[in-house]
């Protein structure tokens, strides 16, 4: 099932590569590119490195049609599937395999040194990733194999909790909380809140309003002196229950004013700057 979920990814593509038929290795000193016919390559085409799972594939394909010429599966690098030559960094020896399991060793070379560097680094990065994945899988297996710590309560096991300094009185009962509609407790108003007093209605009389007393009219309406006397006289202050004044005293006061006015000879009215109210 895991093999079916694996997909093939492309690691490197080089458009120009040469293939050489190499002679058998005579000793363990390694391959040498100088022993090959470098000026007469046996095949030229395109190189493509792909990966599927942990295995990398070096594919030699035709430049135009993309037809597969040879394929070299690589399970480990560096290893027997890909080897470097002793006298150059642009040439390698790879082991190709067909569908029947037969294998052969051929030499490949790049005209550009940068292409050879990319070929080498692509294989190194892939197998570095494979190594990291292997280590992660081993760690996960070790974690699964360890006995798990059981922190659950056993059957019938109880615990006792001590919460702060809270002590309950003997024989006392807890006070029920006041709850509002729907069983929700009501919170007190916030401190410093202002209480708005509604304004008084129009039907309520204002106690501070005082009706001014009427000004008594004088018998001599045309006389300016009477007007001045009326202005100089203090206004009566209303009380809660004014006592009626004796009639004789009022008549004596007005009699004095009458006597004074009768003793003054009649004179023609003079213009005054006062405005008559």
UniProtKB/Swiss-Prot annotation:
Residues 222-234 have a biased composition (Low complexity). Interacts with AP1G1 and AP2A1 components of the adapter protein complexes AP-1 and AP-2. Interacts with the GAE domain proteins GGA1, GGA2 and GGA3. Interacts with AP2A2. Belongs to the NECAP family. The WXXF motifs mediate binding of accessory proteins to the ear-domain of AP-1, GGAs and AP-2 through hydrophobic interactions. Selective binding to the GAE domains of AP-1 or to the alpha-ear domain of AP-2 is tuned by the acidic context surrounding the motif and the properties of the second residue of the motif itself. The WXXF motif 1, which is preceded by an acidic residue and has a glycine in second position mediates specific interaction with AP-1. The WXXF motif 2, which is followed by the C-terminal carboxyl group negative charge, allows specific interaction with AP-2. One of its GO terms (cellular component) is clathrin-coated pit. Residues 164-277 are annotated as: Disordered. Involved in endocytosis. It is found in: Cytoplasmic vesicle, Clathrin-coated vesicle membrane; Cell membrane. Residues 258-277 have a biased composition (Polar residues). A motif (WXXF motif 2) lies at residues 274-277. Its main location: membrane. Keywords: Cell membrane, Cytoplasmic vesicle, Endocytosis, Membrane, Phosphoprotein, Protein transport, Repeat, Transport. Gene3D superfamilies: Pleckstrin-homology domain (PH domain)/Phosphotyrosine-binding domain (PTB). This is Adaptin ear-binding coat-associated protein 1. A motif (WXXF motif 1) lies at residues 254-257.
